[in-house]
Amino acid sequence: MLYHHVAENKTDHRYYVSPLLFAEQMQWLTDHGYQAITEATLAEVIRHGGKLPARPVIITFDDGNGDFFTTAYPVMSKQHLVGVAFLITNRIDKPKFLSGDQVTELINAGWEIGSHTITHPDMVRHRVDLDREIVGSKEWLDQKFGINVVSFAYPYGLSNALIIQFVTDHGYTSAARLGAQTHQSEKNLYDLSRTEIWGSFDMQQFAALMPWQ
């Protein structure tokens, strides 16, 4: 699952999910036996074996927008759900984005931090310094927060064979794009699908996206 903002917005019904609707969605997941895992956990189990919960779900947030820390994070904590925050590193500590202290709190609460590049460029349509955006963002996050970032999210959900291979070769164990596929395997660990949750979805539409009812 992919979210961008959890906040009120009367005009943007794609990227903004209202806090009330988000709380209802998280309650639905809990009521239906879903357990949140991280992308790193999924990759580890697929590669090396192990056991996942009966109904695993990965709840991701792209860009590091500050609103989800004050709206989504408390709701998820109450439901004992963890998430994955894919951060654009040059936006950390900027207005309306997560602060370094907030990122640290997420880490201490069991959240995974992933890379969403340094500047969020369209790496498919434009010439981009892949080493800077893909490797540099990981190194910056690793050093600043004392972690080992192993998950990547492609900006705009876009990738190609060159970009996928670059991510594969530079310290990541998985990478995510957009898409509705729910079955993941070792063959697509660097092309994982995430269903984008729009603010216009009602609860019936949300439930229909979930693999277990």
Residue ranges and their predicted role:
Residues 1-60, 65-67, 120, 124-213:
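C-terminal active-site subregion of NodB/CE4 polysaccharide deacetylases
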Residues 73-80, 98-115, 168-169, 186:
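Acidic (Asp/Glu)-rich catalytic clusters
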